[in-house]
């Protein structure tokens, strides 16, 4: 039990009989047996408590890993949703860009077909086209030199 051989146990029993006497020896043996039983129960209880704590620590580690996995999965789903939203926005912007480019192409076609027709149809240009150019003023001052119209 404790690494003792048979001769050592006999020596301890003889010493116990000498010190305790035959009257008290049975009571002492019962008390020693109860002590070892209690000691064994305490050791087993401590062992089971330690094992439970180790299991709890392992469960905590597992829970932490699962939490990290769930967090990573949630962030990847958020990124995926964000990328999907960006793709949707990109397609909307490209559609708008295409419609603007088509409008620009139509305007360019109209301009290149007959620019004079567009100028004649423009109400702002109608006033300027119908007006006669004004005569230049007789006195022009160019680079501090006076040019006077000679009559």
From Swiss-Prot:
Q: Where in the cell is it found?
A: Cell inner membrane
What membrane topology is annotated for this entry?
Answer: Single-pass membrane protein
* Transmembrane found in the keyword field: yes
Keywords, ordered alphabetically: Cell inner membrane, Cell membrane, Membrane, Protein transport, Translocation, Transmembrane, Transmembrane helix, Transport
**Gene that this sequence comes from:** tatB
What family does this chain come from, according to its entry?
Belongs to the TatB family.
Gene3D superfamilies attached here? 1.20.5.3310
Protein's name in the database: Sec-independent protein translocase protein TatB
Q: Which Pfam families match?
A: TatA_B_E
Quaternary structure, from the entry: The Tat system comprises two distinct complexes: a TatABC complex, containing multiple copies of TatA, TatB and TatC subunits, and a separate TatA complex, containing only TatA subunits. Substrates initially bind to the TatABC complex, which probably triggers association of the separate TatA complex to form the active translocon.
Task: Give the GO molecular function terms.
Answer: protein transmembrane transporter activity
Q: Which InterPro entries match?
A: TatA/B/E (IPR003369), TatB (IPR018448)
Q: Where are the transmembrane segments?
A: 1-21
Described function: Part of the twin-arginine translocation (Tat) system that transports large folded proteins containing a characteristic twin-arginine motif in their signal peptide across membranes. Together with TatC, TatB is part of a receptor directly interacting with Tat signal peptides. TatB may form an oligomeric binding site that transiently accommodates folded Tat precursor proteins before their translocation.
Please name the GO terms of the biological process aspect recorded for this protein, alphabetically.
Answer: protein transport by the Tat complex
Q: Where is the composition biased (Low complexity)?
A: 120-131
Q: Where is the composition biased (Polar residues)?
A: 132-142
Q: What is the lineage of its organism?
A: Bacteria, Pseudomonadati, Campylobacterota, Epsilonproteobacteria, Campylobacterales
| Start and end residues of each stretch annotated as Disordered | 120-151
Any one annotated GO CC term: TAT protein transport complex
């Amino acid at each position: 039990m404790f690494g003792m051989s048979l001769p050592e146990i006999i020596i301890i029993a003889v010493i116990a009989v000498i010190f305790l006497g035959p009257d008290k020896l049975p009571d002492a043996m019962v008390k020693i047996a109860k002590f070892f039983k209690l000691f064994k129960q305490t050791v087993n209880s401590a062992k089971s408590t330690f094992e439970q704590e180790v299991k709890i620590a392992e469960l905590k580690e597992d829970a932490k890993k699962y939490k990290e996995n769930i967090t990573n999965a949630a962030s990847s789903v958020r990124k995926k949703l964000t990328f999907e939203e960006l793709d949707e926005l990109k397609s909307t912007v490209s559609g708008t860009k295409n419609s603007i480019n088509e409008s620009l192409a139509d305007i360019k076609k109209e301009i290149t077909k007959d620019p004079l027709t567009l100028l004649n149809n423009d109400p702002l240009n109608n006033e300027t086209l119908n007006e006669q150019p004004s005569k230049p003023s007789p006195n022009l001052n160019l680079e501090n030199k006076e040019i006077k119209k000679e009559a």
